Amino acid sequence: MTGPLFVFVHGWGFSPGFWDAVRDALPDGESVAVDLGFYGPPSLPHIPAGRPPAGRSVVAVGHSFGALWLLHERPFAWDGLVLVNGFPRFTEGDGFAPATPRRVLDRMIARFDAAPQTVTADFLRRCGCEAPPPDGLEPARLGEALRALRDWDARDALTGPALALAGAQDPIVPPAMTEQALSGFDTAWHPEGEHLLPLTAPGWCAERIAAFAAGLTK
């Protein structure tokens, strides 16, 4: 049997290296990481079309906006989806509540054109990341993704096997938002976890991602 293929997608303001510790902690399988191009050219690793080889599952793993991007864009087929601090929609509206008020994103977008570095750094700090954004910030792609974060609604795309990994102390995606957005799907809660579980609890994430993947082939 061939081990699973894990495809990781980072969130808004981050880069593929965000996943390094989780990928290193996975006990089995192969992993690749999508680059949404926030600090350089975007890159989507080649994912074989059609069904995977017998016994091999494809598991998509998205953090925060990365989970929304996967659901909205569907860039490849997967057998299971893991949403880490993730959601199928970010802003309130159309019966989706509690969630982030749309005006919060409106303010970020209004400021972004004039001060992309500042807006990005402020958001990263709110997430719990004190390090400044890396060099090479790409305002056009970050700005487009910020508008997507405000406008996209991928609830109808959330079908099939899925697992949520959530932080009970997440200031960006609070527990009440996770519970209503992902009701009906298995959710693993990290009691001290905030919004950056792949950085603060990589082993915890890897263990649960691997167990979810193993369950897909049973």
Regions found by a protein language model. Name each.
Residues 2-43:
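Conserved HGGG/HGGXW glycine-rich cap/lid loop of the alpha/beta-hydrolase fold
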Residues 61-66, 70:
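Gly/Ala-rich beta-loop-alpha elbow adjacent to hydrolase catalytic centers
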Residues 75-111, 144-154:
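Flexible "cap/lid" loop of the alpha/beta hydrolase fold
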Residues 111-156:
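Conserved alpha/beta-hydrolase catalytic His-Asp/Glu region
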Residues 158, 164-166, 170:
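Short beta-strand/loop motif that positions the catalytic acidic residue
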Residues 160, 174-183:
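Short alpha-helix in the alpha/beta-hydrolase fold that links the catalytic acid
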Residues 193-206:
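Catalytic histidine-centered segment of alpha/beta-hydrolase-like enzymes
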